[in-house]
Amino acid sequence: MMSKQEFLGALYNGLSGLPKEDIENSVQFYSEMIDDRMDEGMTENEALEDIGSVNEIIQQILSESSLPKLVKRTVSTSDFVTHTYTVEDDFTNIIIEDAESNINFYKSNDDKCRVLCDEREKVTHTVVNENNTLTVRVKDERNWFERINIGFFIADMRVSVYLPKNKYDSLNAASMSGDIDVANEFTFDNAKVGSISGDVSVKADVKQELNISSTSGDVYAENLNLEKFNAESTSGDVIINNISATECINASSVSGEIDLSNVKGKEIFANTISGGVMLADTVASQKLKANSTSGEIDLKRCDAKNIVLDTVSGEISGTLLSNKQFITETTSGTVNVPQCISNEECRITTVSGDIYIKIADQ
């Protein structure tokens, strides 16, 4: 049975002949369908079974994908204007939802909140402060065919949020095709930041839980001390630097690379299907698990009480900080690991890849 990530990856690859935006919208749609079923109490496997065969879904989407011929046009900065919305009252929660704008957060220099939105014909925004929550949403009144930008040059539109305080309770920011950048001047208790085709970068301090995601863009986070952290991308890279979590750290991608550097946590999981996994100075107090189907796994000065490394055709190599009881399995690869006696276990499995592990400073 496929996992959710494998299902979305197969869907993404199966629709490769369609426009990029159509692919990403389809992937996002089915991702939300799976999540909705799991919210209703289904397991991941039950949700996937209820949705149906990914191959049948691909064929259905392809059969319905005929589009009218479009007239080529150019959208430049002269086609939109920047409107400034001033927010008078205080708030502690922030919700930003847009379709194609880049979203950026800045510290206000005059203790006032302002939201600057690039807008054009039929594309405006609503900015509301209610129930202690600042909500910014795009209002797109275009017809569906006006939103398809095949072969066009599209200038970047922006939503710039200037915040007067450094500390807020929650942040929820989402864009369809824009990049999202959360600067390091701010602190949130919880944050959820995601884009379908844009890159996502979070440098702000998050105290409890941070979730960042992108379907085809890269996701990046650094300099965090928090409880839980989750980062995922379908075809983009996941890059995590200088992060410490008291609970779980999870990084996943279907075809992108996973790069963790100076990462500490109780449990750390790095999972990709066709990309590589690179872990440097990554230490879990309990469990460290990394797996890739066809990519390599490379470790530099990593450690945990329990380590699980798994590939099908990729090589597994690197250095650990302390002795382990090594349990290795490979069908056709070469195995070279230290002969150690330890109560801590490192289990390494590959089908056709080689295994080369050393203990640092030995």
Spell out what each predicted region is.
Residues 1-362:
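Intrinsically disordered, low-complexity terminal regions
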